Amino acid sequence: KKFEYIHVEHKLRDTSSKEAQDLKKMLKKFMIECKIITWKKKKNIKKTQSDSRDFRFKVFENYCKTKKINTILLGHHFDDFQENFFIRLLRGSGLKGLVSFHNYRNLQRNNINIVRPLLDFSKEDLFYITKNTFNFYIDDPSNRSLEYLRSRVRFMITNLKKNGLDEKKFKMTFENLISSNNSIEYFVQKNISENSSVSLLKKNNGKAFLSLEFFSNTDEIILRSFTKILQDI
């Protein structure tokens, strides 16, 4: 199958435009055509790392819709996965939010598959592969700036590793949380199937009927059940 390569140039740094062109030239040596999409935003509006990620994902999604592509491959690695977990923890995410970073998920609104094939590789692994395959690596200094939450979390994880939180223990904890989340999802589905019915008049226009037993569950099960039913109608 054909692959299309996209690099989003956010213009967050003075050197980013040159780096994007260097990347394009390097990939061309390997017969890879890379499309560069530049983020054009008003100068008086401050760009953040979070805004950049949101924009980048919209670019990928819109590009896939235009080109009728059904799968997006993202370059997230294990370090990203770990950082994302602690960022969500610091923001007060619930169990479902903490375990929502997966190798695969489907965007139902556009039926686009999101695949992260590199989650089992550390940043150090990928750095080694990149240097030895392409002899080329772009270092983003903002990754070390404590101005950004992700960088501060990265520093925190380094200290946690020194105190015993290695990759094996982290993955074990994450798998335990997934198991707990799956148990809750089981009872959510049970609650919906036994204590509710949905009548669809037409697409995105329907009614839901709930029995009193629907509300006899824990708050988390009731909330998740409500959310799923609302998505259906």
Question: Across the structure, where does each feature detected by a protein language model lie?
Answer:
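Core alpha/beta nucleotide-donor-binding catalytic domains of modification enzymes
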Residues: 1-156
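Short, structured loop/turn "capping" segments at alpha-beta junctions
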Residues: 136-139, 165-170, 184
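AMP-forming adenylation/ATP pyrophosphatase catalytic core
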Residues: 1, 8-10, 39-41, 55, ...
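Internal, active-site/partner-interface "lid" segment
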Residues: 143-151, 168-179
